[in-house]
């Protein structure tokens, strides 16, 4: 009987879903893509991400952005020659392709997860969030 090499790859390691989740399944990655995609100019600064993703620590957010640039999901753009320079992140084609997954997640959430009556099906996420916030504030008044 032939002994298996401990470094031999298992068939499930070739699974495209598993390979995709190694990148997109990391915490905050999908939400960073969503924020960049729905930002007005389709570029976003680190500080804008910090304001929008309040539960993400600066360290984790920085690490995730670095990973996403290395993976080819985002492009890091430095503007200005004097300090402080401005750094913006924008989606690459690979990153924009992931937005289809976000739309599918939204559809799934609307069908199976969202327990409220607020309907954001035909809105982009940025507009939806603003409308929900406005509705919440008026209900508290």
Name each region found by the language model.
Residues 1-7, 12, 41, 75, ...:
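C-terminal regulatory/oligomerization modules of transcriptional regulators
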Residues 24-27, 92-96:
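Alpha-helical hinge/cap motifs
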Residues 15-60:
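N-terminal helix-turn-helix DNA-binding core of bacterial DNA-binding proteins
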Residues 55-56, 63, 85-88:
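Intrinsically disordered, low-complexity basic tails/linkers immediately adjacent to helix-turn-helix/homeobox/MYB/SANT
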Residues 2, 69-90:
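Beta-hairpin "wing" of winged helix-turn-helix
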Residues 61-71:
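Basic amphipathic alpha-helical segments that dock to polyanions
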